[in-house]
């Protein structure tokens, strides 16, 4: 059953015991997608106004790209994409992430990373917080900071096992499932 943004939950996908949040209905409907992008932009203006001239948006592949790209465009902010290992052709900064059902290396273009000190993190789902925590830790090793983290939705059932992300100024989600 879709929620107010058109999201639906697919049980036991991609592995047994994991409930996958399907964002395709949201992406397929401009009447849902447009207001979501507008709301993200509004939250960034409200919660990171002091950083808008010096921050960049950072987002993990691949679903984060779908939200972060139009937001970066609308706000006139640079976009730095975090990719799985082997996808960055120029000077990759490589780090490791463990998430709820996988473990893998991620990478960021070192030249792009060097250009900014403050980041606004955007992703679709806030589940265990492992992706956010891994990127936050990788940035900290390079003296970079995430000042705001935004997610389309947070999985309420996982709030007690989320990674250590309390040092962030704000972690906001448009809704909780």
What residue spans do the PLM features occupy?
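Short glycine-rich phosphate-binding loop at a beta-alpha junction
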Residues: 50-61
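Short Gly/Thr/Asp-enriched flexible loops that form oxyanion-binding sites at enzyme active sites
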Residues: 66-75, 134-137
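Acidic, divalent-metal-coordinating active-site segment for phosphoryl/phosphodiester hydrolysis
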Residues: 123-133
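Active-site-facing substrate-recognition patch
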Residues: 1-51, 109-112, 116
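Short, glycine/charge-rich flexible loops or terminal/linker lids adjacent to PRPP-binding catalytic cores
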Residues: 77-120
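PRPP-dependent phosphoribosyltransferase catalytic core
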Residues: 3-6, 133-177
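Structural motif
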Residues: 55-56, 118-120, 148
């Amino acid at each position: 059953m879709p929620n107010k943004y058109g999201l639906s939950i697919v049980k036991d996908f991609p592995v047994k015991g994991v409930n996958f949040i399907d964002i395709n209905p949201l992406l397929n409907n401009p009447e849902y997608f447009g207001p979501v992008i507008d709301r993200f932009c509004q939250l960034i203006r409200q919660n990171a106004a002091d950083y808008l001239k010096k921050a960049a948006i950072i987002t993990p592949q691949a679903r984060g790209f779908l939200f972060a790209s139009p937001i970066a465009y609308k706000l006139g902010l640079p976009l730095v994409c975090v990719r799985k290992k082997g996808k960055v052709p120029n000077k990759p900064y490589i780090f490791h992430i463990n998430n709820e059902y996988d473990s893998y290396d991620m990478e960021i273009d070192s030249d792009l990373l060097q250009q900014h000190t403050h980041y606004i993190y955007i992703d679709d789902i806030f589940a265990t917080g492992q992706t956010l925590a891994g990127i936050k830790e990788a940035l900290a090793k390079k003296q970079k900071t995430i000042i705001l983290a935004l997610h389309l939705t947070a999985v309420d059932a996982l709030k007690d096992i989320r990674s250590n992300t309390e040092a962030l100024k704000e972690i906001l989600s448009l809704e909780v499932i």
